[in-house]
Amino acid sequence: MIKKVHHALIENELTKLRDKSSSSSQFRMALSQITSLLFFEVTKESPLEEIVVKTPFTKTKGYKLKNEIVLVPIMRAGLGMVDPIVRYSEKIRVGHLGIYREHEGTNVISYYKKMPENIGNSHVIILDPMLATGTTLATAISSIKKNHPIKISVVAIVAAPEGIKAVEAAHPDVDIYLAAIDEKLNKDNYIIPGLGDAGDRLFGTK
């Protein structure tokens, strides 16, 4: 299911991401802010486990997340979305997927996968700023499903309608959280209006 998150701060930071004059540092900070806000939405209704804690004065009821969270950034651009989330819990683990789509055609190349052990009781959150054709993300979800997590969600920043349609058709059970749904893909499969190549803008490369 597609879940576009509406928030004034997201719109403010998204404008910075789109602005071609933003420096890599400004791009990185805006990406971090939006990622945090989307993460709050992903985990808003996460199941909790009741525990007892001691305050300085007495015992009281408290809660902790029932399921572990595993982040899986799609390299490279997804790496910029990890740090804003891991600071919320020392128990968040991180896997990595190296997948890319060849610009000429729709062939997807999977070149790296490193996942934490025993994620069967985990909520996996895939991180990728751009959802363009959907072939890379659909491949990533299929790969992670082989590890049998309890739940898979996706945090992306900008998506094209074509990519949304492709991923929903392949994985209707996966929730996708977005900051924006853009107009279309151009002839080179870049999102329009988009924000350019997220990896290059994040790391200052070309």
Curated annotation (Swiss-Prot):
Residues that coordinate or bind uracil: I191, G196, D197, A198
Signal peptide: none
Known regulation of activity: Allosterically activated by GTP.
Enzyme Commission identifier(s): 2.4.2.9
Binding residues annotated for 5-phospho-alpha-D-ribose 1-diphosphate, in chain numbering: R76, R101, D128, P129, M130, L131, A132, T133, G134, T135, T136, D197
Keyword match Transcription: no
CC cofactor note: Binds 1 Mg(2+) ion per subunit. The magnesium is bound as Mg-PRPP.
Pfam families: UPRTase (PF14681)
Gene3D superfamilies per the UniProt record, alphabetical: 3.40.50.2020
GO MF, any single term: GTP binding
Pathway per the UniProt entry: Pyrimidine metabolism; UMP biosynthesis via salvage pathway; UMP from uracil: step 1/1
InterPro entries: PRibTrfase_dom (IPR000836), PRTase-like (IPR029057), Upp_B (IPR034332), UPRTase/APRTase (IPR050054), Ura_phspho_trans (IPR005765)
Cofactors named for this entry: Mg(2+)
Cysteines joined through disulfide linkages: none
Family: Belongs to the UPRTase family.
HAMAP family, sorted: Upp_B
Annotated protein name in UniProt: Uracil phosphoribosyltransferase
Classification of source organism: Bacteria, Bacillati, Mycoplasmatota, Mycoplasmoidales, Mycoplasmoidaceae
Originating gene: upp
